[in-house]
Amino acid sequence: MFWESELNAPLLWCLVETESCSTPRTRLPTTALGSCGERTAVQEPDWASVTLGVFVCQACSLLHRGIPHISRVKSVQQETWDASEVELMAAMGNEPAKAKYEQKVPAFYYRPKHTDCKLLREQWIRARYERNEFEFIEKQEPYSAGYREGFLWKRGRDNGQFLSRKFILSEREGALKYFNKQDARDPKAVMKIETLNATFQPAKIGNPYGLQITYLRDNSTRNIFVYHSDSKEMVDWFNAIRAARFHYLQVAFPGASDEELVPKLTRSFMKEGFMEKTGPKHTEGFKKRWFTMDDRRLMYFKDPLDAYARGEVFIGSKENSYTVLPGLPTSTQGYHWNHGITIVTPDRKFLFACETEAEQRDWIAAFQRVINRPMRPQEYAVEAHFKHKP
């Protein structure tokens, strides 16, 4: 992933002559944006691909080293350069490289940020420079065809074992389905594209290619955890889901622009982690639970990899009497962690406790972001039909 100057002015080159080499240097704006989304306050990036002619950030330089037949990385300041390498950097540069290697990126294709998992960042690099997927549209067929079929390792709902399962994604049927047996005629589950979401969770699943798929079943969230041994296959599945969502939303919202639809294709969870909770009477003992904040849905699980939440709480806006407060009511007892949070809703209060003050701050900030955001019309319908499991 390369540095992209946001200025229209050409890059300023100077050659620093030493006894054995010429070293290229470039002056960028004080905050430069890389294609991985990273901003930095340094003016002189330290790494470059001398075969592609682009500057790369340090994290992405490590990924470029994984494709040495395509990209050879050098330090700008600490390694020797020959004249041909300097000439290539001067002739190419980041903007021309972007115009060449990203000329036909589909609107739905996920462009990773520097905070995304290694899998997404690596496959983004390989898709551009190794497979040239965005120069030749026919190479995008695995995730652009509207239909995808294959096998993924799926975690069992009850036994926790990963078993090979057949998956079919069909835009025509508006669903992602999976089958317990290879020759089964009826699917075990049908996940409507309308409520489908996918997010990579390598640490949580315990696999570098682990993907968490969620969908609504009877207005409750169902989790499915899958992976594939091939990294490209897994990212192709992810982008195929995004393509299906994109085309569904284009029909559902015909007047919306691509820029409006793309943020709605898939989403990462706002916050996850363990907290303690008590029951609706506030006299029950506090129990440790895994919490997931998925937009306005706060879900809690006994185990992070549970298929279903033990309960779900809708978090509305401050205009609708939702509030987050630090601490717990003075009469509260039975908690083990000392950093409390109180969520006030129109119906009741929810009491949580965090292990550390830092976790408390992070959770409060996540709740506050949602509460400060006005509710959209469709969210009122979600609130009205929301099911809370006590």
Question: Where are each of the predicted segments found?
Answer:
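Polybasic phosphoinositide-binding surfaces of eukaryotic membrane-targeting domains
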Residues: Y147-M191, W237, R267-G316, F350, ...
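Disordered regulatory linkers adjacent to lipid/PI-binding modules
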Residues: A145-Y147, F246-Y308, F314-I315, E319-N338, ...
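Conserved beta-strand elements of beta-rich interaction domains across eukaryotes
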Residues: T26-P29, V42-P45, V54-F55, S61-L62, ...
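Cys/His-rich Zn2+-binding "zinc-finger" mini-domains, especially FYVE domains
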Residues: M1-Q78
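Eukaryotic intrinsically disordered and solvent-exposed regulatory patches
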Residues: S5-A9, T26-A32, A41-P45, E85, ...
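Cys/His-rich, Zn2+-coordinating zinc-finger modules
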Residues: F2-W3, L7-N8, Q58-P142
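Cys/His-rich zinc-coordinating "finger" modules and their low-complexity flanking regions
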Residues: M1-T18, E122, R126, A145, ...
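Pleckstrin homology
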Residues: F2, A127-A145, Y227-K264, S268, ...
